[in-house]
Amino acid sequence: MPHYRRILLKLSGEALLGDGQYGIAANTLDRIADELAEINAMGVEVAVVIGGGNIFRGAGLAASGMDRVTADHMGMLATVMNALAIQDALERRSVFCRVMSAIKINQVCEDYIRRRAVRHLEKGRVVIFAAGTGNPFFTTDSAASLRAVEVGAELLLKGTKVDGVYSSDPVRDPEAKRYQQLTYDEVLSKRLEVMDATAIVLCRDQAMRIMVFDITSPGTMVAAARGEPVGTVVDPGLPSAQEESS
């Protein structure tokens, strides 16, 4: 039996890279689609927010002089491309799926309307939210927090390249400690790289539970949807974080 009724998965665009430096790796896309299809078959209602960093990173060009709003709009379009790729992969697995965009591009996908999104989820369709919040200066992490709250998700799953939240970069620091559980305020005060501060504050204010897990580890996403203890949990929780050795 699934542990959660409705979840939202936040994927960075880089999660689709695989071993490449740019674009979408077919084998990585297929693995993620397989796991999403398995979760959907369990009866869990699944929403997805996808980034676009595998195709375009606006921050770099903005730092080089491009107008920030223009750069962010280009990044939004990159997320639409990724969303369409995931939709196609799911439909090839006979999973009903809808892409909903925060910016109008309705010859390609639906406009985001909250009530319609909830109805799609209730009908068992996977819903992929594209184009972030539709506003510049907001990250796709903030979009994930916002959409999770709006559609009433019980869990926000944040897929990363490591198996949880660490006290420092575990690649560079062999002494880094992995947290099993954190509160929202601990994430903010310790400046831990879970999500940006705007996203964390929204989750805190709405008591949206976050689970950070390793998206590159096959089966971990499904295990998280079953309620198994994977990665790091961020919630109102305990007043002090629990750590374990990396």
UniProtKB/Swiss-Prot annotation:
Query: Which enzyme class?
Result: transferase
EC numbers listed for it are 2.7.4.22
What GO cellular component entries does it have? Answer: cytosol
Disulfide pairings = none
> What's the domain of life for this entry?
Bacteria
User: InterPro entries attached here?
Assistant: AceGlu_kinase-like_sf, Asp/Glu/Uridylate_kinase, Uridylate_kinase, Uridylate_kinase_bac
An example GO biological process term is: 'de novo' CTP biosynthetic process
Main localization (coarse): cytoplasm
> What reactions does this protein catalyze?
UMP + ATP = UDP + ADP
Question: Does the keyword field hold Nucleotide-binding?
Answer: yes
Q: What does the record note on quaternary structure?
A: Homohexamer.
Output this protein's name: Uridylate kinase
Q: Which organism is it from?
A: Halorhodospira halophila (strain DSM 244 / SL1)
Record lineage: Bacteria, Pseudomonadati, Pseudomonadota, Gammaproteobacteria, Chromatiales
